[in-house]
């Protein structure tokens, strides 16, 4: 999927309206607890400022439900951005209106203003055309660099593109299209997908789409117990989606018919309860005790999965292998992260599909050892499901 990007347009002296994802976590004192998203948007921001553009940034933060709410002001972000850029960042009181327009028109080349939270207006999420038109009037060119909201047709991501001639991708979205897009369209083979998480229902569309592309699928997370139940194994008190047992059998059949190697764990870590203090040990999947809960893949499985990962040229990972937030139940997820890092070092393309997997890789301290970590949660998932993302479809080809 080729889209025009920030590198393809003239910026000098132009008002550049950029949608970024500054939806960062704040503590009770309105201090930013994780500025990763701000840092990720810096390459696009610096490109505009260094090339003499006049930058207007817009974002949402949290869920203020269409009302002005000071708890969700982007002011702390403006402060942090000014520190990171080492230059002043004007904070607008609003994202539309006469005063905002005057501030925008007063910008000089290489200056930047951050508009107030878009979601203070219900029209943003409703993709209201008048609101979109008013936003569009602030800039001469539009750049979308917010992959995390690209799966939503909102005024600032989709509606706005109807009122601008130039609508291009920022560097973050360009990277997502490059890595996620290439993996889905022309992966180097063998292509191994690792899918985890608690529910088959959450991953069924991803599985269906990946079955057209992959050579091998490794399954982990609590969704394995629905497969085991379907195969007639006892699973103790492990999480199971009773309504998805038929579906699990259908998936196993489909993999077989398509010649896809679909691997399930051979052993799992079990515990009497999901708590940080619970004792845990490994059991073969044929011998899960009645009162126990499966919480992670076992060491034998971790080794099998590691070998599969190391034999691949493209590896895509979405969803943890177990309850990795609890250290005692994190070994399987950490082993996969480690194997991915080793595969990267050996020249494979390794892609983390956002969300929990990204958190797991960060917890393992291996975030810099992957080819690409997607910045979108829901957006990455929908992309992997083969769905068109409105915020990306709307950009210039």
From Swiss-Prot:
Any one Gene Ontology cellular component term annotated for this protein: cytosol
Keywords assigned: ATP-binding, Cytoplasm, Glycolysis, Kinase, Nucleotide-binding, Transferase
UniProt keyword Amino-acid biosynthesis, yes or no: no
Chain sites annotated for binding ATP: 203, 294, 325, 354-357
The enzyme's E.C. designation: 2.7.2.3
GO molecular function, one term: ADP binding
GO biological process: one example: gluconeogenesis
One Pfam family hit: PGK
Pathway stated in the Swiss-Prot or TrEMBL entry: Carbohydrate degradation; glycolysis; pyruvate from D-glyceraldehyde 3-phosphate: step 2/5
Subcellular location: Cytoplasm
Reactions accelerated catalytically: (2R)-3-phosphoglycerate + ATP = (2R)-3-phospho-glyceroyl phosphate + ADP
Binding-site positions, substrate: 21-23, 37, 60-63, 119, 152
PROSITE patterns cross-referenced by the UniProt entry: PGLYCERATE_KINASE
Keyword Methyltransferase among record annotations: no
Organism domain of life: Bacteria
Cited InterPro entries: Phosphoglycerate_kinase (IPR001576), Phosphoglycerate_kinase_CS (IPR015911), Phosphoglycerate_kinase_N (IPR015824), Phosphoglycerate_kinase_sf (IPR036043)
Subunit: Monomer.
Entries under PANTHER family matching the protein: PHOSPHOGLYCERATE KINASE, PHOSPHOGLYCERATE KINASE 1, CHLOROPLASTIC-RELATED
Family according to the record: Belongs to the phosphoglycerate kinase family.
Protein name (record): Phosphoglycerate kinase
């Amino acid at each position: 999927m080729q889209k025009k990007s920030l590198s393809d347009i003239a910026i000098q002296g132009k008002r550049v309206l950029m949608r970024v994802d500054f939806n960062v976590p704040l503590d009770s004192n309105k201090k930013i607890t994780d500025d990763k998203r701000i840092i990720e948007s810096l390459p696009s921001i610096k490109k505009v400022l260094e090339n003499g553009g006049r930058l207007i940034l817009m974002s949402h933060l949290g869920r203020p439900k269409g009302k002005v709410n000071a708890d969700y002001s982007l002011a702390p972000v403006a402060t942090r951005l000014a520190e990171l850029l080492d230059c002043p960042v004007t904070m607008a009181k609003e994202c539309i209106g006469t005063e905002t327009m005057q501030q925008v028109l007063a910008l000089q080349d290489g200056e930047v203003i951050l508009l107030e939270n878009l979601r203070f207006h219900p029209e943003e999420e409703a993709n209201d055309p008048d609101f979109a038109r008013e936003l569009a009037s602030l800039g001469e060119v539009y750049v979308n660099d917010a992959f995390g909201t690209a799966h939503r047709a909102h005024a600032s991501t989709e509606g706005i593109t109807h009122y601008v001639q130039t609508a291009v991708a920022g560097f973050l979205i360009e990277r997502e299209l490059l890595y996620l897009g290439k993996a889905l369209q022309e992966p180097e083979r063998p292509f191994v997908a690792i899918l985890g998480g608690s529910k088959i229902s959450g991953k069924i569309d991803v599985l269906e789409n990946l079955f057209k592309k992959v050579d091998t699928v490794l399954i982990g997370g609590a969704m394995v117990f629905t497969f085991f139940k379907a195969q007639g194994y006892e699973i103790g008190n492990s999480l199971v989606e009773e309504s998805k047992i038929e579906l699990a059998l259908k998936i196993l059949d489909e993999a077989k018919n398509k010649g896809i190697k679909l691997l399930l764990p051979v052993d799992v870590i079990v515990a009497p309860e999901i708590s940080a203090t619970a004792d845990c040990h490994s059991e073969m999947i044929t011998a899960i005790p009645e009162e126990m809960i499966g919480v992670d893949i076992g060491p034998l499985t971790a080794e099998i999965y590691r070998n599969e990962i190391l034999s691949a040229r493209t590896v895509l990972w979405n969803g943890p292998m177990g309850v990795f937030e609890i250290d005692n139940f994190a070994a399987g997820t950490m082993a996969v992260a480690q194997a991915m890092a080793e595969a990267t070092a050996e020249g494979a393309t390794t892609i983390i599909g956002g969300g929990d997997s990204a958190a797991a890789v960060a917890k393992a301290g291996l975030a810099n050892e992957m080819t690409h970590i997607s910045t979108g949660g829901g957006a990455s998932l929908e992309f992997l499901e083969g769905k068109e993302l409105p915020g990306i479809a709307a950009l210039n080809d």
